[in-house]
A protein has these predicted regions:
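Periplasmic c-type cytochrome electron-transfer domains
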Residues: 1-73, 96, 108-131, 143-182, ...
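Glycine-centered loop/turn positions within well-structured domains
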Residues: 80, 99, 145, 207, ...
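Extracytoplasmic/luminal low-complexity segments enriched in Pro/Gly and acidic/polar residues
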Residues: 191-196, 218-222, 226-298
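Sec-exported extracytoplasmic/periplasmic mature domains
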Residues: 79, 83, 87, 106, ...
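Sequence/structural segment immediately N-terminal to covalent heme-attachment motifs in c-type
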Residues: 67-91, 126, 189-216, 220, ...
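Gly/Gly-Pro-rich "capping" loops immediately C-terminal to redox-active cysteine motifs
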Residues: 75, 87, 91-130, 149-160, ...
Length: 298
């Protein structure tokens, strides 16, 4: 092989190597910029978000395959639409009087989670998310139930029409009811006043508090009324001054309806996500054993 031939051959080899390097670089670049295929992560378990639109929210929560996607999408929806009021950690924001979604205190549903009851379903959460609380929607939670203001000047027009303009309790009687509420919530209270306050609390001609808060003040979930024995469930404060203001002025918490703000799959996903946070005490999905104790019904 003469010198000229060797030079030409070397150039061809070098050109081939450089060409291969260029092709490899292009392939790497294309791979880096190509959209991520989520099926690579989950394989046969992958569910596209829109597939959550048709199944019931209770079915989604029972299905490992559907639940996986619901938790991912639900967290995203929660962060975008719910965290501003309920907090990034789901524990509520005191200044906004929003409930802790990670505790065992459920409003507008069945038995308390701590009792092991199975009445609490993802569909309970879905209804609240979909229609809101006193949102103006015809299906809103709490539309027919408000905490009545015991001072007539703070009553709504509807309350005045239903209950009149009489002052049901004197200031002294309100003080006695406050002491009873402090006592059942584990706070220091005047025992003599609390004893008289207990009578007023259960008197259907005076305080009539038990009608919404139940005997002993444990609350009635279907009404969304506060469990007065748990200070953590007081959205408006549990000290004397806050309780007094609640009795005098009444309380009417609200939450917007998301029925026309979220896609069907988003609404169901965030409902499942919130359902699995309840009773965990932390912003994370429960362990399988904890989840098993709250397995949703069909």
């Amino acid at each position: 092989m003469d010198k000229k031939t060797r030079v030409l051959r070397s150039r061809y080899v070098m050109a081939g190597v450089m060409g291969a390097a260029v092709l490899a670089a292009v392939a790497v670049a294309e791979q880096a910029t190509a959209p991520h295929d989520p099926t690579d992560d989950y394989g046969e378990f992958y569910v596209r978000p829109e597939e959550l639109a048709s199944p019931s929210v209770n079915r989604i929560a029972r299905s490992l395959r559907l639940n996986r996607q619901a938790m991912v999408l639900g967290k995203k929806v929660y962060d975008e639409h719910c965290a501003s009021c309920h907090g990034a950690d789901l524990k509520g924001i005191p200044d906004q009087h929003t409930p802790d979604l990670t505790d065992a205190e459920w409003r507008f549903s069945g038995d308390d989670l701590e009792s092991g009851g199975l009445k609490k379903l993802p569909s309970d959460v879905e209804w609240t998310v979909r229609y809101g609380v006193r949102s103006g929607h015809e299906n809103a939670r709490g539309a027919e139930v408000n905490m009545l203001a015991f001072y007539p000047e703070f009553r709504t027009k509807e309350d005045t029409e239903d209950f009149g303009s009489d002052k049901f309790l004197t200031d002294a009687e309100i003080d006695e009811v406050i002491e009873y509420v402090l006592q059942i919530s584990g706070q220091q209270a005047d025992r003599a006043k609390a004893t008289r306050g207990e009578v007023l609390f259960h008197d259907n001609t005076k305080g009539n508090c038990f009608d919404c808060h139940d005997n002993g003040g444990t609350g009635i979930d279907t009404f969304g009324s506060t469990n007065l024995t748990r200070r953590s469930s007081y959205l408006w404060g549990s000290d004397r001054a806050s309780i007094r203001e609640s009795i005098i002025k009444g309380r009417r918490g609200v939450m917007p309806a998301f029925d026309d703000k979220l896609k069907p799959e988003e609404l169901k996903a965030v409902s499942v996500f919130i359902f699995w946070q309840a009773g965990t005490g932390e912003s994370s999905q429960p362990t399988p054993s904890a989840r098993e104790n709250r397995r949703p019904n069909p």
